Amino acid sequence: METVALIDYGSGNLRSPAKALERAAAGCHASFQVLVTSDADAVRKADRVVLPAVGAFADCKRGLSEVPGMQLMAEGGREYGVTEGLGWIKGEVVKLEPADPTLKIPHMGWNELDIRREHPVLAGLRERAHAYFVHSYRFAVERPEDVIASADYGGPFAAVVGRDNLVGTQFHPEKSQETGLALVANFLTWRV
């Protein structure tokens, strides 16, 4: 049985992402133990690691020196001041500023994914799949080839980024119903 470590960095409720991982594993008939942990040794030993999308860039980075999700893969961010990221994917996290001033921030709701390139975690997603977003900042990715899918909210933004064995989503897979569960199942069965 493989282990998926869901990192608990003390910044939010992890029940929803843990349940999504369990449902996706059952749906793809994969044998995974979901371990919610803040123990660095357990994370190192895990077969897969998930950084849930709860909390803010600066709070989580400063509080634990662990990464809360896609945005911390960036070189830096500007949420709650300038914060250094991990630099795994070139780019910066900046305020979401839609061209249409009537659009509200934070962006909360369903958006269509525009798949830019093939990737195993998006395999089998239906064309124009929708995902659920809640965010006020976006990852301004420097290299277009690192954007796997985008969405639009008064202008395009990176919805899924990835390189090598790393993938991050701006949306909440655990709240994105069929699309999210398919992505999580693909992640669990993905072989690099």
UniProtKB/Swiss-Prot annotation:
GO molecular function: glutaminase activity; imidazoleglycerol-phosphate synthase activity; lyase activity
Ribosomal protein in keyword set: no
Domain Glutamine amidotransferase type-1, first and last residues per copy: 3-192
Recorded catalytic activity of this chain's protein: 5-[(5-phospho-1-deoxy-D-ribulos-1-ylimino)methylamino]-1-(5-phospho-beta-D-ribosyl)imidazole-4-carboxamide + L-glutamine = D-erythro-1-(imidazol-4-yl)glycerol 3-phosphate + 5-amino-1-(5-phospho-beta-D-ribosyl)imidazole-4-carboxamide + L-glutamate + H(+); L-glutamine + H2O = L-glutamate + NH4(+)
Active site: H172, E174
Protein keywords: Amino-acid biosynthesis, Cytoplasm, Glutamine amidotransferase, Histidine biosynthesis, Hydrolase, Lyase
Location(s) in or outside the cell: Cytoplasm
Assigned GO CC terms: cytoplasm
UniProt cross-references to Pfam families, sorted A to Z: GATase
Family annotation (InterPro entries): Class_I_gatase-like (IPR029062), GATASE (IPR017926), Imidazole-glycPsynth_HisH (IPR010139)
Catalytic activity, EC: 4.3.2.10, 3.5.1.2
Pathway, per record: Amino-acid biosynthesis; L-histidine biosynthesis; L-histidine from 5-phospho-alpha-D-ribose 1-diphosphate: step 5/9
A GO biological-process term: L-histidine biosynthetic process
Domain of life according to the entry: Bacteria
Purpose: IGPS catalyzes the conversion of PRFAR and glutamine to IGP, AICAR and glutamate. The HisH subunit catalyzes the hydrolysis of glutamine to glutamate and ammonia as part of the synthesis of IGP and AICAR. The resulting ammonia molecule is channeled to the active site of HisF.
Subunit comment: Heterodimer of HisH and HisF.
NCBIfam families per UniProt: IMP_synth_hisH (TIGR01855)
Name used for this protein in its record: Imidazole glycerol phosphate synthase subunit HisH
UniProt organism field: Azospirillum brasilense
